């Protein structure tokens, strides 16, 4: 080939590059190949002592993920497309050791992009070491004790305000009843709680408020009990002997049902009865019948909160499962949505960037109390509680705070 012909071809090549370069530049960089799915993982107590609550969380997670996937998935800017979510879900059998092992498996074998929490303070306290150790972003809606968030963890986020705040809210409401002339001062309190960090934090919250206002409150008995209580007689004999005006307890659904059934059989009565966040659950009310009337609950959510978001979720949950929504379902649903939103905000599946997006979460129009999700520096939300009271005929009234109240509290409980 002659030099002139070779030069001619080189010149043609350069001309073509010059012609198409602007077009290629206009198209921007080519997005990397997207994964087929965003893989989220969780381990829930689907059998064992916490099986009922674990099943509630399963339904909430699955409803949120179906809704996201029906809309095409999560938009991830790095790949310039929506990617559907795949949820890997294991049964931890309500066992702490199994829960830790399963979260290790989700990270090391299943190679999840992010993690959703289980249910119950003991389980969550145990298994959160795995996401922190491997630096995998994690959000839970089933663990409220401050102990979980006091360990300087950077990858752990929680959707439930603290149990200490729950106890303080309950005591503030009782003070309001005193100011309204419905409750005497000082009022004598019997407080019991499960022998876990959950129950200890509840009892401490009651004691702290008592020490701060001795003119209002006097604790006459402060007693722990073992989780999964089989016989409440000994515990309630102590409560009976204390001659308290108010009975406050912190218990899981099964223990609440056991304790209050025996409470009723013994003919006990107090001006106010509360089992902390328990009392309004349909399963418990069905089991206890009219004995559950007038119990006061301090909780993280209610379908009766007067917001569009709460109403919309209650309706979609009822349609999906043909049963009423409770806080377990709502918080699980919102937990999954918060994780999806963090991935979308990060615009990538990079775990550090998703973690950073979670830390900066400011999600408006949420169904949580107050309508906003954000996390404090320790990773825990700090929104308000809503207080409810069981009313005769299976009805429920929101009683506190005034911004959401639908009825006045019945205090004292009517004598039967």
Question: In which residue ranges do the predicted regions lie?
Answer:
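Extracellular/periplasmic periplasmic-binding protein-like sensory domains
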Residues: 263-333, 344, 399-416
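Segments of small-molecule ligand-sensing domains
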Residues: 319-326, 340-399
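Short, low-complexity disordered leader/linker segments with a strong preference
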Residues: 1-39, 70, 414-416
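Sec-exported extracytoplasmic/periplasmic mature domains
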Residues: 62-73, 104-112, 128-136, 175-179, ...
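Signal peptide-proximal N-terminal region
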Residues: 33, 38, 59-86, 211-217
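Extracytoplasmic ligand/sensor domains, especially the bilobed periplasmic-binding protein
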Residues: 112-222, 271-296, 304
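Beta-alpha junction/loop-to-helix N-cap segments that form part of ligand/metal-binding clefts
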Residues: 29-31, 52-57, 74-150, 159, ...
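Extracytoplasmic "Venus flytrap"
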Residues: 41-62, 90-97, 119-120, 192-201, ...
């Amino acid at each position: 080939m002659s030099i002139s012909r070779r030069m001619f071809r080189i010149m043609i090549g350069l001309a073509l590059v010059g012609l198409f370069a602007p077009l290629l530049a206009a198209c921007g960089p080519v997005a990397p190949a997207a994964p087929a799915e965003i893989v989220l993982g969780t381990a829930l107590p689907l059998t064992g002592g916490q099986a009922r609550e674990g099943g509630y969380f399963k339904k909430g997670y699955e409803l949120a993920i179906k809704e996201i996937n029906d809309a095409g998935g999560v938009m991830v800017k790095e790949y310039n497309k929506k990617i559907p979510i795949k949820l890997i879900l294991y049964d931890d059998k309500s066992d702490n050791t199994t829960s830790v092992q399963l979260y290790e498996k989700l990270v090391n074998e299943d190679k999840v992009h992010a993690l959703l929490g289980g249910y119950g303070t003991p389980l969550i306290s145990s298994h959160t070491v795995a996401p922190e150790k491997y630096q995998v972003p994690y959000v839970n809606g089933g663990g409220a004790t401050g102990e979980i968030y006091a360990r300087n963890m950077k990858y752990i986020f929680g959707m439930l305000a603290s149990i200490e705040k729950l106890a303080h809210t309950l005591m503030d409401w009782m003070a309001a009843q005193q100011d309204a002339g419905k409750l005497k001062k000082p009022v004598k309190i019997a407080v019991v709680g499960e022998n876990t960090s959950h129950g200890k934090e509840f009892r401490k919250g009651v004691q702290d408020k008592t020490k701060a206002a001795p003119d209002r409150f006097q604790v006459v008995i402060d007693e722990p009990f073992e989780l999964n209580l089989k016989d409440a007689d000994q515990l309630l004999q102590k409560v009976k002997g204390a001659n308290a005006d108010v009975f406050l307890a912190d218990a899981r659904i099964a223990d609440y049902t056991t304790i209050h059934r025996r409470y009723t059989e013994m003919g006990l009565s107090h001006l106010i009865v509360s089992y902390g966040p328990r009392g309004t659950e349909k399963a418990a009310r069905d089991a206890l019948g009219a004995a559950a009337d007038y119990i006061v609950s301090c909780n993280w959510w209610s379908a009766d909160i007067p917001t569009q978001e709460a109403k919309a979720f209650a309706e979609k949950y009822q349609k999906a499962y043909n049963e009423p929504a409770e806080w377990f379902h709502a918080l699980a649903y919102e937990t999954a949505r918060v994780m999806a939103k963090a991935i979308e905000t990060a615009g990538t599946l990079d775990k550090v960037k998703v973690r950073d997006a979670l830390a900066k979460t400011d999600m408006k129009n949420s169904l949580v109390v107050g309508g906003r999700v954000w996390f404090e520096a320790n990773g825990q939300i700090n929104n308000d509680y809503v207080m409810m009271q069981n009313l005769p005929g299976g009805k429920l009234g929101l009683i506190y705070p005034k911004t959401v109240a639908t009825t006045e509290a019945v205090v004292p409980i009517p004598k039967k």
